[in-house]
Design a protein with these regions (language model features):
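Amphipathic, membrane-active segments
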Residues: 56-77
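Amphipathic alpha-helical elements of HEAT/ARM-like alpha-solenoid repeat scaffolds that form extended
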Residues: 51-52, 105-124, 160-165
Length: 180
C-alpha cells in the first residue's frame, strides 16, 4: 500500500506486488521483481527479510530514512563478519577466498544478497537508489559474479549455471535505476 507519495510498502500478509511497488521498480525489474521463487532472486530468502526490515525502517523514519543506515544497523549484528578486504577482491582472489571454506561462500553470498536487496528495496520503496545504496548493491553484485567459477567440488549450488544471466539482469537494473 502507498503510505505517502514517496514510499511504497507491501502488505505484510501479501507477496511482492506491482501495486505496492514504485513504478520505476516495476518497469526496471520485470524479469525478477514479482517472482521470488529461487535463491537467485534478490528479494527471496535473505532479500525478503531485508526488504521487510527496510520497509519498517522507512515507515519508522519517514522522510529521514536512509537505506544504507538500515543496512549498517542490520549487518552490525551479524556474525561472522566478512572482512572488509573481501569486498574489494578481484575475481581470482575472491574465488580463492570462497574456496577456502564452504562457509566463506555461504556467509559472503548471504551478505552480498542482503546488500543487493537493500539497493533494490530502496528502488522498490522510493523509486530511486541513493549513490551509497548503489555502491552497496554493486558490492553485492561483484561478490556474487565469481560464484559460477568456484570449483564444483566445494559446493554444488543447483542454480550455479543460471547465475551469470541472473546477475546480468540485476546489474542492468542497477545501471538503469534513477539515482536519488
Amino acid at each position: 500500500m502507498e503510505t505517502s507519495q514517496k514510499h511504497y510498502f507491501d502488505d505484510a500478509d501479501e507477496a511482492l506486488s506491482p501495486e505496492t511497488s514504485r513504478p520505476n521498480f516495476v518497469k526496471l525489474a520485470p524479469v525478477f521483481s514479482m517472482t521470488p521463487e529461487t535463491s537467485l532472486h534478490p528479494l527471496s530468502d535473505d532479500g525478503h527479510d531485508t526488504l521487510r526490515g527496510l520497509e519498517e525502517w522507512f515507515s519508522e523514519h519517514g522522510g529521514t530514512a536512509v537505506a544504507t543506515d538500515y543496512l549498517e544497523a542490520l549487518l552490525t549484528g551479524w556474525a561472522p563478519k566478512i572482512p572488509a578486504r573481501a569486498w574489494g577482491l578481484d575475481a581470482p582472489k575472491l574465488i580463492a577466498w570462497h574456496s577456502k571454506s564452504e562457509m566463506n561462500e555461504v556467509f559472503l553470498a548471504s551478505e552480498a544478497r542482503t546488500r543487493l536487496a537493500t539497493a533494490l528495496g530502496e528502488l522498490k520503496i522510493t523509486g530511486s537508489i541513493s549513490p551509497a545504496g548503489l555502491a552497496e548493491g554493486r558490492k553485492g553484485l561483484n561478490a556474487l559474479r565469481p560464484v559460477p567459477q568456484i570449483p564444483r567440488g566445494t559446493r554444488h549450488w543447483p542454480y550455479r549455471d543460471e547465475v551469470p544471466s541472473a546477475l546480468a539482469d540485476i546489474g542492468n537494473v542497477l545501471d538503469s535505476a534513477p539515482i536519488g
